[in-house]
């Protein structure tokens, strides 16, 4: 992987990640872009104890532009990327919810092909995305304001995505996200109750012995969790516990693309041939880099994992009522996790079944 850092016309950082070491990225962005001054603040809810960021600037995001005006496509379309094509590119979000002392937001373009999706990538291309996520995690973790790095992809207009080009985002939070805090609390309680046991290890061992396993390799395992909140919710874990993407060894990095690409393609097949691509939310959960607030728990106790979910309002015919969320945020599923796992095994690639 070759990494090249440069600047856009408005001063934002842009980083190229190339498969070929001899790739040269020396184009200069000469667009008449005004420098954006974005401020944000993080407010803490005194009753719930969690935090929420907000952008203190007028809304101006690009909303569903035609393909010939996509700002994530290569040059020639008045866009952020100035070269004819790219492998993977990351740049600072022009309209961030986190900025300055409140963290940072970045956009990750998985490919220069506007009509592709992550599932269309080759294993080599997908590996490059993993390496880019890892590098950004390392870089952002060194910012004084950053406590947790959150890499994710939302796909589909149903999720609220406003650009069709295959891309994800990275939020570098100045606090520990609520879901991570809940996991750390449970981790600490389990460690105390068992005299040092690790909750993540226990959960993974139990799931691998059960009927909810969807896909398994030598170094990775995907399963529908026993207590899944969403109708189709898959958790993907490395079998060797590591706190973040930086901890993955070469064997795990090499196998990940094959496992993840098959998982994505299964989700695209669950509603049958000829159906449009399935919208989803995919997010990496990494250990916070700041001081953990739970006594007896360290970063190494946390387990890196990817949470992949299909929203309840997608394809209602297949997921009847999918999920009901009441005013008290109590999740109710109409698709049992065991049935969801069975369905995802049914649509395995023919080569995966052999």
Swiss-Prot record:
Cofactor: binding details: Binds 1 zinc ion per subunit.
Catalytic reaction(s) noted: alpha-D-galactose 1-phosphate + UDP-alpha-D-glucose = alpha-D-glucose 1-phosphate + UDP-alpha-D-galactose
Record-level GO BP terms: galactose catabolic process via UDP-galactose, Leloir pathway
UniProt keyword list: Carbohydrate metabolism, Galactose metabolism, Iron, Metal-binding, Nucleotidyltransferase, Transferase, Zinc
Molecular function, one GO term: UDP-glucose:hexose-1-phosphate uridylyltransferase activity
Top-level lineage group: Bacteria
GO cellular component terms attached to this protein's record: cytoplasm
Residues that bind Zn(2+): 70, 73, 114, 165
Catalytic residues of the enzyme: 167 (tele-ump-histidine intermediate)
Binding annotation for UDP-alpha-D-glucose: 154, 169, 332
The protein's required cofactors: Zn(2+)
E.C. code: 2.7.7.12
SUPFAM superfamilies, per the entry: HIT-like
Pathway info: Carbohydrate metabolism; galactose metabolism
UniProt region (Disordered), positions on chain: 36-72
InterPro entries: GalP_UDPtransf1, GalP_UDPtransf1_His-AS, GalP_Utransf_C, GalP_Utransf_N, HIT-like_sf
Annotated PANTHER family: GALACTOSE-1-PHOSPHATE URIDYLYLTRANSFERASE
Family that this chain belongs to: Belongs to the galactose-1-phosphate uridylyltransferase type 1 family.
The name this protein goes by in its record: Galactose-1-phosphate uridylyltransferase
